[in-house]
Amino acid sequence: MKKIKILLDTMGYENTLEHVIKAAKDFYYQHEDDLEIILVGNEQLIKPLLDNDWRLFPIVHTEVSIEQNDTILSARKKQNSSMHLALRYLKDKQANGMLTAGNSAVFVYNAYATIGLLEHIKKPAFMPFVPTIDGGVTNLLDVGASIDLDGRDLFNFAIMANTIAKMRTPNPRVGVLNIGTEDHKGLPYHQEANELLKTSNLNYVGFVEPKTILEREVDVLVADGFSGNIALKTMEGVGKTISNFLKNEYKKPKNLFAALLSKPIFKKMKKAFDYKEHAGAFVLGLDGILVKTHGSADYQQFMSALKILYETIKADVLNEIKKDLNNYYGQ
């Protein structure tokens, strides 16, 4: 059986190395029959954490790291960084996919420069999975990789995200993020995307307002990187604010009884919206499977991101995306 090979960038994030190495070990043992995880980073730091398992994990050694405060310009001076090395390995087809928790802007830029775009694609997109109230997810893209987009870009994003959504849902519903649901609403690129999607064979439902994102009105929601990023961060901020408010209120003696009664409900709500279960965001539009997780990722988030990457590679999603794009563009 041909093994799936995953490159795991172990450097440049805010948490300790123990989290990523433990996740690598545990995930490997869940799929050891068809999986190889290549660790990219400082071998002297990695090996002691692997203990007796070090022979099971190829290591690409480097002591150079792209830090969270690096800029695209400063990162160019670090060509031997773990991120650069992993991307070059992926470009050379020495692995099937890559996971990093490193600097987002630098990662997208270097992935674009190293891997290159798919045919028909002009811009890359970040696509996280947004947890919804019914326990499902909405594929939201773009959330910051590309700002200056046109309707054709949004159309292409919808095609690619739809391919991934089909892993979970047979006939994904697709929408465009807008300030209203009426056809006349939005900017010219909204109108262009709307017309293109209406004439496609995607299950297009039209414009979607931000207020319904968490209700999973659609399975795929496309936006420009500016609007998508604001929507995502607003949801994250509101969730954090509500959580902090409730914690402070329930600490008050007069609310103790109410806190005890409502604890199961809020525990259920927390689980439904727990982003740690969906902690990987795809960089779509590039000729490779690339997943980015949070810069402060812990063990659980690395496990979640590895699962997303592994399942996507196993389903041959990159080739499915290429086929779907070629079908739309007549090749």
UniProtKB/Swiss-Prot annotation:
Record-level GO cellular component terms: cytoplasm
Pathway per its UniProt entry is: Lipid metabolism; phospholipid metabolism
The protein's GO terms of the molecular function aspect are: phosphate:acyl-[acyl carrier protein] acyltransferase activity
Write down the top EC class of this protein. transferase
Q: Which GO terms describe its biological process?
A: fatty acid biosynthetic process; phospholipid biosynthetic process
Tell me the PANTHER family matching this sequence: FATTY ACID/PHOSPHOLIPID SYNTHESIS PROTEIN PLSX, PHOSPHATE ACYLTRANSFERASE
**What protein is this chain from?**
Phosphate acyltransferase
**Which organism is this entry from?**
Ureaplasma urealyticum serovar 10 (strain ATCC 33699 / Western)
Q: Which gene encodes it?
A: plsX
